[in-house]
């Protein structure tokens, strides 16, 4: 397996009652489509131990990507991101998303 030199973390929160719909979308093809993008080598999904202050369940996706250039290519694919936004539209009020990315600067 290729090594990940760059990482994308997508934190997201799902409103009570919305988890089945959101996870069905993710597991039904969204994650696989992201993983087909050049340079994406692995993904982990986390369920956070505690909900947020409003009771929304907290989750995160951690994607291992070969290089920053692969990440930039993915982020520059506006058609793909528009497609994802369109797919999320039916449950947009049940989902909050925050993204951040970077390289490891410490590991033990």
Q: Where are the predicted features?
A:
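An amphipathic, aromatic/His-enriched active-site/gating alpha helix that lines ligand/cofactor pockets
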Residues: 37-41, 54-56, 64-101
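Active-site-flanking beta-strand signature of metal-NTP-handling nucleotidyl enzymes
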Residues: 5-13, 61
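Short, flexible turn/loop "capping" segments at secondary-structure junctions
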Residues: 1-6, 53-55
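A general secondary-structure boundary signal
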Residues: 19, 23-27, 58, 96, ...
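Short, low-order "capping/linker" segments at domain edges
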Residues: 103-108
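Short amphipathic alpha-helical segments
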Residues: 18-45, 83-84
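Short, solvent-exposed loop/turn elements at beta->coil junctions and helix N-caps
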Residues: 46-51
């Amino acid at each position: 397996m290729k090594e990940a030199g760059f990482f994308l973390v997508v934190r997201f929160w799902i409103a009570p009652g919305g988890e089945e719909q959101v996870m069905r979308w993710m597991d039904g093809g969204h994650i696989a489509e992201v993983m087909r993008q050049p340079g994406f080598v692995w993904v982990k999904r986390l369920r956070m131990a505690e909900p947020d202050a409003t009771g929304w369940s907290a989750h995160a996706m951690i994607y291992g990507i070969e290089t920053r250039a692969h990440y930039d290519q993915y982020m520059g694919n506006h058609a793909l991101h528009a497609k994802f936004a369109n797919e999320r539209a039916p449950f947009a009020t049940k989902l909050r998303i925050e993204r951040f990315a970077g390289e490891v600067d410490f590991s033990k």
